[in-house]
């Protein structure tokens, strides 16, 4: 009985693979045309220059935060890793126009689950850039981050980063 009450908690895997949330061309974080992302002020990560307008979950976990302007979503893995998927640059100023959110905060997600659909042409014509940053916002709490050597990526299929959480 005491073992049930005071037994060890379920072991959480410290390693996590992050898949591409968008289909398109991989962009090194340093090449994202925004210093906040390029200088890693928000954390380590990468960008994607998308060729289609759907964002899927790059990890298994929960939706932590859906931005009211629909241009970004925060995700959290079971091991505590926090990820921001931000569609385009300066897209907050579009105030949700061109975006359709498919999830809510608290939703359970699996790799490949649709999160947001967006009008690629509209965003491309009305935002600073369509390049979309994917950032580990708590990368200071990781032991290691290995970025794969990729170029063309497919949403929910191409592994981009392998992370070990501290």
Swiss-Prot record:
Binds 1 zinc ion per glycerol kinase EIIA-Glc dimer. The zinc ion is important for dimerization. Its cofactor is Zn(2+). The active site is at 86 (tele-phosphohistidine intermediate). One of its GO terms (cellular component) is cytoplasm. PROSITE patterns: PTS_EIIA_TYPE_1 (PS51093), PTS_EIIA_TYPE_1_HIS (PS00371). It is found in: Cytoplasm. GO terms for molecular function: kinase activity; metal ion binding. Its main location: cytoplasm. The keyword Signal does not apply. GO terms for biological process: phosphoenolpyruvate-dependent sugar phosphotransferase system. Keywords: Cytoplasm, Kinase, Metal-binding, Phosphoprotein, Phosphotransferase system, Sugar transport, Transferase, Transport, Zinc. The record marks 71 as: Important for phospho-donor activity. Zn(2+) binds at residues 71, 86. Residues 34-138 form the PTS EIIA type-1 domain. The keyword Glycoprotein does not apply. The modification Phosphohistidine is found at residue 86. The EIIA domain is phosphorylated by phospho-HPr on a histidyl residue. Then, it transfers the phosphoryl group to the EIIB domain. Heterodimer with glycerol kinase (glpk). The phosphoenolpyruvate-dependent sugar phosphotransferase system (sugar PTS), a major carbohydrate active transport system, catalyzes the phosphorylation of incoming sugar substrates concomitantly with their translocation across the cell membrane. The enzyme II complex composed of PtsG and Crr is involved in glucose transport. This is PTS system glucose-specific EIIA component. It comes from Staphylococcus epidermidis (strain ATCC 35984 / DSM 28319 / BCRC 17069 / CCUG 31568 / BM 3577 / RP62A).
